[in-house]
Amino acid sequence: MTLFRLTTCASFLFLAACKDAALAPCLIQRPPLGGYTMKFTLPGAAPAGCENLMPPIFGDNWRIDGYSDHQIYMKSDLMHYPQDGGDPDPSHSVLGKGILPDEPTNGICTIPDVTEMRSDTDPLGTGQAEFAYHAHGMNFLSGARYQGSEFEAKVDVTIGSCTATYSVQALTPTQIGGTCVTDADCDPFADPAAGRPLGSGINPDYAVACTMEDWVTTYLTGDPTVGICFFTKPFPGLK
């Protein structure tokens, strides 16, 4: 039995219709949308002695899926499976697991805690092999109009012997690899006359723009001339 039920009012990729529909169950958006693109921000300074290891801001993409009994599994694109060149240590799991509630509270569905994801492969190029995530307080924006298409969270990031708690904001459909060069590319609706046969797929309620900040071009696009469509406001990031 799956946790994920499409509503009959879904007419766009971002499922952004039917404002007046009955209370929707807790949902997350599954891997076919490419996962959630995430901005990790370190509030304040890094722990003493960790300034050169913990980036102030960085980006990643997590694939999230759900199974029976409200179980939610997630995996970072930075962490490869052992058979794909990842960490061969069987005691280190690249999969995190949490529990999604049945119904939202005040429009939010919260996964309180996620098991550690770890891959000792230095994915950020810091020179330190140990790398781990421990997410907690994952708050998904719920309701028939949003259906878990964004979340905020706190994530304990471990690099080498250093650990710091980052604030995270995340958006789906994925923006990995780059999706824009101008703000017009972030329009959720297609405009064939302007050379955009497809829209961005992002919920039209979200305040987004094309950003080419360093955390984007360094960690997500690899190109200073290509950006991603991302929030311009803190969670819930609505217009």
Regions from the language model: what does each represent?
Residues 8-12:
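Sec-dependent N-terminal signal peptides
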